[in-house]
């Protein structure tokens, strides 16, 4: 079952749309309630609607008995800017979970049933938010994640990314590198140092993707035991 929902967000100070896919009445046996829930974050330039319809999410939801919630990322790298009433990280990482559970009582409230994933920019957001809100998410899935957002944005070829995007979203490089909320690698260390249980991590990418060279070693050394799946190009 596919539903497009709208709810007022305190973090965004406005109404926000999100898409919900439930494993119910979709040609398969209905899944057992309450449903485990996956929050799927779009990449840069992609809308929630594109993700909801371009990928076979309804079939995956029905096959595996998992509800899927897809919000818009708004090219904001899931950062928080209260001065602009644009706290995308707070909205998606925490508030959207509360809103969706209240609107759809069939969703599980248990941490062990709550997952977050994303593609590219959404992969960065899933890692950053999953490691920040460790009490909410049990698993993180990353598809070609832009884990080193500073390297990606500051070294992007001309015309690929707006030149002022990194300072507008993250400030300077030092502020990004030192922030457990913005830098997923610092987020891993912060979670462990504070005694919080980091979510499990699964990562998927092509062999020629520009994933950070130290990502696997850092995650592995943190005892998160990441699972990595590499794909070769058929061309």
Model-derived segments and their meaning:
Residues 1-235:
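Non-catalytic cap/lid and distal C-terminal segments of serine-dependent acyl enzymes
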């Amino acid at each position: 079952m596919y539903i497009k929902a709208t709810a007022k967000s305190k973090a965004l100070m406005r109404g926000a749309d999100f898409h919900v896919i439930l494993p119910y009445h979709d040609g398969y046996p209905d899944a057992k309630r309450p449903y485990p829930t996956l929050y799927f974050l779009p990449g840069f330039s992609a809308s929630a609607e594109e993700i909801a319809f371009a990928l076979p999410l309804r079939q995956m939801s029905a096959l595996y008995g998992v509800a899927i919630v897809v919000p818009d990322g708004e090219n904001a790298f899931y950062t928080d800017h209260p001065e602009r009433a644009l706290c995308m990280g707070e909205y998606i990482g925490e508030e959207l979970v509360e809103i969706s559970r209240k609107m759809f009582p069939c969703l599980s409230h248990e941490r062990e049933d709550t997952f977050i994933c994303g593609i590219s920019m959404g992969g960065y957001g899933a890692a950053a938010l999953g490691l920040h809100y460790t009490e909410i998410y049990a698993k993180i899935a990353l598809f070609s994640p832009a884990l080193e957002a500073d390297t990606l944005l500051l070294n992007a070829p001309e015309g690929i990314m707006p030149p002022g995007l990194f300072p507008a979203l993250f400030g300077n490089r030092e502020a990004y590198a030192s922030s457990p909320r913005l830098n997923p690698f610092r987020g891993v260390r912060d979670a462990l140092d504070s005694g919080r249980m980091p979510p499990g991590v699964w990562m998927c990418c092509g062999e020629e993707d520009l994933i950070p060279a130290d990502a696997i070693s850092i995650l592995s050394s943190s005892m998160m035991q990441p699972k990595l799946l590499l794909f070769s190009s058929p061309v």
